[in-house]
Design a protein with these regions (language model features):
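Donor-sugar nucleotide-binding helix/loop cap in glycosyltransferases
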Residues: 1-177
Length: 177
């Protein structure tokens, strides 16, 4: 990820997507924010030769990534806020934007993000955690692996729900992390 051009070829995506992938890997503490090399955790999980879950197949890895994002108030503010401060069971993206904006206005010392940034952040939150509800999922529609955790559910075109429930697939090792 040091060289944008070679990363686009290696990953087969555009420069904007490479930058997005880099951002989320930093937010999940998988790469170092200074040199973009894998952190110890990134190597432990995803190293192709010795990693515990190089293909992101273990449910425990998804839970760990969720926790790392949800506890990162600086780089994943909307995710952290949603899972620690927002407790409404049913909502739409507009309600989330308004609630997040209000929270940021009350709690942030620095400048509040623009409305377009809030809209984008809430859209990312929904795409990360809610499965696409389509009768037939198109080839070009890929859900985020985090949607497998069942933390946010899509209802209709813009409605969502999130309720507290037992998650028997949450490994005790992740709780102890």
């Amino acid at each position: 990820f040091e060289d944008l051009d070679s990363a686009t070829v290696t990953l087969g995506v555009g420069k904007n997507m490479v930058q997005s992938i880099r951002y989320w890997m930093r937010a999940a503490q998988l790469i170092d924010p200074i040199d973009n090399h894998p952190t110890d955790l990134g190597t432990l999980l995803f190293d192709m030769d010795s990693g515990e879950d190089p293909f992101l197949e273990d449910q425990g890895t998804l839970w760990l990534l969720h926790w790392l994002l949800a506890s990162n108030t600086e780089m994943a503010t909307a995710i952290s806020w949603f899972f620690s401060k927002y407790h409404k069971a049913s909502f739409d993206q507009g309600e989330l934007r308004a609630a997040l904006s209000s929270y940021l206005q009350e709690s942030m010392i620095k400048k509040r993000p623009a409305a377009a940034t809030l809209k984008s952040d809430i859209s990312v939150l929904a795409r990360l955690y809610a499965k696409t509800q389509m009768a037939i999922v198109a080839e070009d529609v890929l859900d985020s692996p985090l949607s497998e955790l069942g933390l946010i559910f899509e209802h209709g075109k813009s409605g969502y729900s999130s309720t507290f429930q037992d998650h028997s697939d949450l490994p005790s090792e992740i709780v102890g992390f």
